Structures are given as C-alpha cells and as structure tokens.
C-alpha cells in the first residue's frame, strides 16, 4: 500500500488517540472534512492496517495490534450446560494497549486492558502457578501475578480450555476443549486424592486454574466436578491447624446452607495423613459449564 501524506496523518492521529477514534474525532484532529477523511481511510481499511468496528453512530476506526501467539483478532466461545460451544464475541487488541470487545448480543466496548468478563478466568494463586509450571513453552515466568494482560491473553488463547467459568478464548483453546474429556483428571473415589495431592505439589496435575493460595486440585469423582483443598501430611502444630481450618470451612458452609443461603456442597475426607475439603464446583455441570462473574 502506497501512503499519501493524508493517510500517514490519519495513522499518526489514530496512534495519538490511543488506537481508536470516531470519524468526527479524526476530522477534528486533522482539520479535514468527512469526505477527505473517508478517502484517506479507504486504502488503510482495504489493507487491514485500520479496522472499522461498531455500528451506526458508535462506529469507530481502530489500529489493530498483533499479539505473538494470539493474533490480531481473538474469538471467544461460550459453553452451555450441555457442553456445546457457541460464539460469545471477539476481541481486537489495539495498538494503544486497549482491547475492543464485541459480544454477539450487541454489546461493544473499549477496555483499557483485559475485559472484565475474563478477569476471573486468569490463572492465579496455587493453581495458577501449577498452570505456569505445566506450560513452560509459554515462556511467561513462573508467577502469573507478574504477567501482563497480553501474557494472560496468550495463556488463555493457547491453553485456556479448562479455566473457571464458561468461556473459552481463542481457536487453539477451543480445539483443546474438544479433546478435554479424554485428558481431564478423573478418580474412582476420594481414596485417590492422596496421589492427586502429591501430583499437585509437584506441579504436574492436569486441571483448571482456580484462584487462591491454599493447595488444591480439580478433578471429577462419581460424575461430579470438584475442587479439593488439602492439608499437609505432617504432624506439626501448623499442619494440624491447617486440617482444623479445612474442617471449620466445611462446617461454616454447611451452616450457611442450613440457613437457606447459597453455599457450595462440601465433604471432608481423611486420606494418607491429609485432610481433604471437597467442594462441588458451581461453574460446572455433568456435561457442561455455567458462567460466573
């Protein structure tokens, strides 16, 4: 694409405006008429250097940004309670660092970084570090707290097939989602939790990235999707206190449920010197998923 002084000026103006602008904003910035700005945008749009987003009065022009390993446009799928995936929307990373999100229900928004509906999905806590350990090819560092929004989006788009909630980000993650039933952790009974705890402490257990610092793992038992916190296997006072706290958490949740308040269904298991607090996941069904915010 050959550039004219005006097309160059349009690109400069878009960069100065954070990678996104309306036609009126470009006209004001360039002191040019609407037809003149439209003519300058035409070759940029044809080449894909500039993208047009939104509709009618909310239409804007954006400078797309390519994220290595992710691309310049990221589809987002939503998994229903039966395990079927359907389009939720798309994400367009912008040169100014923001992300333009378009949902299939018509919502179109500019976000300064990662959209709010993805925040609870980001790998974090104990299982976030397990996620990072499991995927060294991401080359993002061992602690997800230090990841940038681009890093998080890359992790989601490449390996986010089993994250909390019901969204799957990116084509690669969607392809992994379709093979997840064959890879997901499953056990015959809670008696197998001791081995899963050992695997989790070694950072080798497949499973989704639930937040929090308490050691935990996700698995399926008796057809139920569960998240399981576990204590150390030692005999010190600290180890015993951790076991007691897990029992207290179980009793507290039972008390809430007895009072008619929403609470996770939990069970306590003692296996191989450890105490396990098993909680049924509220973002999973037998076959599919449930959204969460």
Kindly label every feature range from the protein language model.
Residues 2-8, 16-293:
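Phosphate/dinucleotide-binding and metal-coordinating scaffold of catalytic cores
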């Amino acid at each position: 694409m050959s550039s004219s002084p005006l097309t160059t000026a349009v690109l400069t103006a878009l960069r100065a405006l954070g990678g996104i602008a309306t036609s009126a904003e470009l006209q004001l910035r360039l002191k040019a008429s609407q037809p003149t700005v439209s003519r300058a945008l035409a070759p940029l749009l044809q080449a894909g250097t500039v993208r047009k987003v939104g509709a009618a009065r909310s239409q804007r022009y954006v400078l797309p940004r390519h994220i290595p390993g992710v691309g310049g446009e990221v589809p987002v799928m939503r998994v229903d309670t039966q395990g079927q995936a359907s389009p939720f929307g798309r994400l367009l990373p912008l040169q100014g660092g923001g992300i333009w999100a378009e949902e299939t229900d018509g919502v179109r928004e500019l976000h300064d970084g990662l959209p709010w509906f993805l925040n609870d999905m980001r790998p974090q806590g104990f299982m976030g570090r397990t996620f990072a350990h499991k995927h060294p090819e991401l080359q993002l560092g061992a602690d997800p707290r230090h990841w940038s929004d681009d890093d998080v989006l890359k992790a989601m788009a490449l390996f986010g097939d089993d994250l909390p909630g019901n969204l799957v980000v990116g084509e690669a993650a969607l392809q992994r989602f379709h093979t997840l039933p064959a890879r997901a952790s499953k056990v015959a009974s809670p008696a197998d939790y001791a081995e899963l705890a050992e695997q989790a402490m070694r950072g080798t257990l497949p499973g989704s990235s639930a937040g929090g610092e308490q050691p935990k793992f996700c698995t399926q038992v008796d057809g139920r999707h569960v998240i399981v916190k576990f204590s150390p296997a030692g005999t010190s006072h600290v180890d015993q206190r951790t076991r007691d706290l897990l029992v207290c958490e179980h009793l507290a949740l039972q008390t809430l449920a007895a009072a008619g308040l929403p609470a996770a269904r939990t069970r306590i298991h003692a296996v191989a010197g450890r105490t396990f607090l098993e909680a049924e996941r509220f973002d999973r069904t037998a076959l599919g998923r449930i959204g969460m915010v």
